[in-house]
Each structure stands twice: as C-alpha cells, then as structure tokens.
C-alpha cells in the first residue's frame, strides 16, 4: 500500500481512530510505523500496569472501609491526563531502540526481572562484541530509568487530578464496585489519600530537584486556577455588553504575554511566589511566533505548565529531553484541551459561565461563523506545531498521538459550523 492509498483509508470514518492516525502518519511521512505501533502497545501495557499497582492499595483501603473482601472491590478513575507521560515514555523507548545494537530490543523484557538475562551475546561464537554488549546494557538501563520516572510521573498526575476533582466537587470520574455504603465522595477521599502516600514514597528515591520541579508546576497551575473567578466575572460582564470586559478578555485571556507589564501577573506567569532558581521558564521555552499563539499564556497556565513540569521531573532525574520535544507535548495537550474538551463542553461552559478559548471566541467574534473559524484555526496552530516538533525530535509516536487528537475532535457541534 502506497502513501496515497493510506491517505484515502485515513479518511474512512468507519476505521478505528488510532488506525486512521497511523495511516495518516504514513501518508505524510512515507514511513509505515510498525515498530512505533509495537512500542505504543508496550507503553500502554506498562502504564496500565503502573495504574493497576497504584490502585491495588486503593481497593484494599476501600474494602476496609466497607468491611468486605478486597477481591470483591474494583476501583477505576477516568482521566486522559496520562497521555503526555505515555508519549514521553514512547519517545524514550524509541531513543533506546535506536541507540541499541542491531537485532537487540531493549524494551522487550519482563518489567520486574533483570533485563540482562535476555541480552544476546553479540559477535562471533568465540569472540563476543564487547562494545555492542555494553551499548545494550546502557540502553536497557536507560529504559529502566525511563520506566521508573514514568511510574512516579503517572502516579503524581493521577494524585493531582484527583485532588483538583475533589476541590471542584466533581466525582463522576471516580467509580467503585463491590463496596456498599462507600459513596463517590468518600471513594475519592480514600483514593487521593492512598495515592498521595504512594507519591511521597516514590519521591524518596529521587533527588530533591525532582520534587521541586513537580511542586513548582503545581504551584503555578494552582495560581492560574485562583484566577478562575476573575475570568468568570469578565465573561459574565462581557455577555451583558461590557466593552471593558470584552477588551480584558481579548488582551489578558487571548493575547496575554509571558513578559512585560501585566497587572495580574508577576511578569512571567500568574500570581505565584517567586522561585529562587525556577526550572519552568515559558518565556524562554516558546520561540519564533509561538508567543503570539492565541490563548497561549492562559492555556499554558491551565494545562501546559503541568507537563512542562513533568518534563523537568525527567530531567531532574537524569534523563535528557529536548526542548523541542517539550514543546511538542505542551502544544499537544493545549490543542487537545481545546479540540476535545472545550469544544465538547461548549454548551455546558456557556451555561456555567466558564471562560475557555471556545466561549471566549463566541464573545469576541462578530459572527458565529467567524468564531468557529477562529477556534479551528487556533487549535490547528497548536497541533501543527506539535507535529513539527515531534518530527524534529524523531518521535513518531508523539506525531501519531497529535494526529489522533485531531481526528478525535468534532468541531461540527459548534455554532457557525455551516452557514
């Protein structure tokens, strides 16, 4: 099958979205990513194992609360926030595979068993290739290190997401079976407490800088969340025709700057105590015309900063990751937030007076058609940039992930889709 045929198949809506994303990647690059698909399956399996292990003590604690057999309890939590960690692990898997001797796969091993048991003897029967053997050892160690940090990152992301959900009294994503008398709010309390303890245990195995990167990202994220009432007030006033509120939405929410005077900012991000030696520097991260992307500052504070901090956790643990890959992750998650969540939730956000890039555009634009086009154009800029950076860093899995986000979205639900 050639690239043109792959492109045609990628447009067939009856096919699974994940397959269409792979086909579109092949059509665009000419590279049919069999190895990448295999790595994705390994990433999925590893992260699923991490989550299962993290939730096992949650189920134990819920069972104790309910006074039932732990084997009868099933706990689940619905979140998409682990996707950037999965893409990062896939990127590190890919790097280790490329750096390994021919014929050796550093990822293909049992997670808990010593991977060196499966390192082949490279070279002739009488004279092994010691250099190749050492390269294999190094890449196996790199995979182990990447997986260990990813475990910390995934559990920390789950812990933080649960904490945010509880603060907002949103319990729909917490699901438990087999524990009569334990309602969702109580389930959430138990789950978050257990995960918080697990996160602290995992942090003990790393330098303080890893915890510092995580804490810095959380503080900045919470500082942005603290501005939510202000943005809600702007939206309410703008809907009443307040010209000053509309101007503030345009200047602060849509076109806010990471540098320069801003009455509601410390000059870099939203109100947050200065950090002596910050590792999160958005004013230095984005290059070229990227600082002018619509809604970049506010959406970076809303969702992007957590994943900037995630990459810094890997770095603080001794794993090198390129700035270009970090941009790919941040742009993907911002694009996904708008393209998947904000578009789908437009009607609810409008009713709840929740300012998002989507509700903002329908206030700022002169017509619904213009607002629709602005939403699509803004999201496309983020996802296109993410895809370019994925290619630049030889991370096809991230490129396919970005394509997957685009194909999952349905902007036709918005007003102004068709005149």
Task: Specify the residue positions occupied by each region the protein language model found.
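Primarily interfacial, aromatic-capped hydrophobic alpha-helices that serve as membrane anchors
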Residues: 194-233, 305, 365-408
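Divalent-cation-assisted or electrostatically stabilized phosphate/pyrophosphate-binding catalytic cores
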Residues: 175-204, 287-301, 327, 350-391
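Aspartate-rich (DDxxD/NDxxD/DxxxD) Mg2+/diphosphate-binding motifs
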Residues: 110, 116-117, 121-143, 147-149, ...
């Amino acid at each position: 099958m050639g690239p043109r045929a792959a492109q045609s198949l990628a447009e067939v809506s009856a096919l699974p979205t994940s397959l269409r994303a792979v086909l579109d990647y092949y059509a665009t690059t000419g590279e049919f990513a069999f190895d990448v698909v295999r790595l994705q399956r390994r990433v999925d399996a590893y992260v699923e194992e991490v989550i299962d292990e993290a939730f096992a003590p949650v189920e134990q604690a819920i069972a104790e609360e309910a006074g039932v057999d732990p084997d009868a309890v099933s706990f689940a939590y619905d979140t998409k926030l682990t996707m950037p960690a999965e893409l990062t692990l896939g990127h590190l898997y890919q790097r280790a595979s490329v750096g390994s001797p021919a014929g050796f796969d550093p990822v293909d091993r049992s997670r808990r068993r010593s991977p060196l048991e499966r390192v082949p003897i490279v070279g002739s029967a009488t004279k092994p290739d010691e250099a190749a053997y050492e390269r294999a050892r190094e890449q196996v160690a790199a995979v182990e290190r990447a997986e260990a940090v990813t475990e910390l990152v995934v559990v920390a992301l789950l812990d933080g997401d649960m904490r945010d959900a509880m603060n907002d009294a949103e319990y729909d994503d917490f699901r438990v079976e087999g524990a009569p008398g334990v309602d969702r709010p109580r389930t959430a309390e138990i789950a978050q407490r257990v995960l918080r303890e697990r996160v602290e245990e995992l942090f003990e195995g790393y330098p303080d800088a890893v915890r510092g990167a995580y804490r810095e990202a959380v503080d900045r994220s919470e500082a942005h969340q603290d501005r939510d009432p202000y943005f809600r007030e702007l939206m309410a006033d703008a809907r009443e025709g307040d010209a000053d509120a509309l101007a503030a939405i345009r200047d602060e929410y849509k076109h806010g700057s990471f540098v320069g005077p801003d009455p509601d900012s410390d000059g870099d991000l939203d109100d947050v105590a200065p950090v002596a030696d910050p590792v999160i520097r958005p004013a230095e991260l984005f290059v070229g015309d990227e600082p002018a992307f619509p809604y970049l500052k506010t959406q970076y504070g809303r969702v992007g900063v957590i994943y900037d901090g995630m990459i810094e956790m890997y770095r603080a643990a001794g794993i090198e990751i390129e700035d270009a890959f970090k941009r790919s992750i941040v742009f993907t998650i911002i694009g996904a937030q708008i393209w998947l969540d904000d578009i789908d939730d437009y009607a609810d956000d409008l009713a709840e007076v929740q300012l998002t890039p989507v509700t903002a555009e329908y206030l700022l634009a002169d017509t619904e058609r213009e607002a629709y086009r602005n939403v699509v154009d803004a999201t496309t800029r983020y996802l296109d940039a993410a895809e370019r950076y994925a290619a630049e860093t030889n991370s096809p899995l991230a490129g396919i992930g970005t394509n997957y986000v685009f194909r999952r979205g349905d902007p036709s639900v918005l007003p102004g889709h068709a005149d």
